[in-house]
Amino acid sequence: MISTEGIKDLEAVDIEKLLSILPHRYPFLLIDRIVNIDGEQEAIGIKNITINEPHFTGHFPTKPVMPGVLILEAMAQTAGAIALLNLGNKRTNLVYLMTVDNAKFRKPVMPGDQLKIHVQLLKKRSGMRRFSCVAKVENVRVAEAEIAAMIVEEE
């Protein structure tokens, strides 16, 4: 179990810690690490995009582009991970996506890119969290959205 003591001082969460926090696994774990964590307030998720990912075989065969819905999922996983970190990583908790608002896709994300997902907490009420998310490649905004999620006890 990851302690929440000193979470504001935690600078990064590596893949091993992510695997202990999130239930997602290959091919659906869409973040490689989280950096610049400021408690539950904000963090940056990192996803290294490679041609070996299964969605590139069909999206699109001659010009591979990361599907926008997977960028949204990477945003949700980053937000969910920081929310769970601040609960002390209780394995009985899961984060379910509730809404996606104002999603915009500005530029394609392709193999070789490093996606940086900037997540900021907007609102916290009970088990609900609302986040502002901005995805960037080389400091250029490629996608953005507001997401809401609910933390629930796993049955």
Swiss-Prot record:
It holds the Pfam family FabA. One of its GO terms (biological process) is fatty acid biosynthetic process. It catalyses: a (3R)-hydroxyacyl-[ACP] = a (2E)-enoyl-[ACP] + H2O. Its EC number is 4.2.1.59. GO terms for molecular function: (3R)-hydroxyacyl-[acyl-carrier-protein] dehydratase activity. It is an enzyme of class 4 (lyase). One of its GO terms (cellular component) is cytoplasm. The active site is at H59. It is found in: Cytoplasm. InterPro entries: FabA_FabZ (IPR013114), FabZ (IPR010084), HotDog_dom_sf (IPR029069). Keywords: Cytoplasm, Lipid A biosynthesis, Lipid biosynthesis, Lipid metabolism, Lyase. Involved in unsaturated fatty acids biosynthesis. Catalyzes the dehydration of short chain beta-hydroxyacyl-ACPs and long chain saturated and unsaturated beta-hydroxyacyl-ACPs. PANTHER family: 3-HYDROXYACYL-[ACYL-CARRIER-PROTEIN] DEHYDRATASE. HAMAP family: FabZ. Belongs to the thioester dehydratase family. FabZ subfamily. This is 3-hydroxyacyl-[acyl-carrier-protein] dehydratase FabZ. The gene is fabZ.
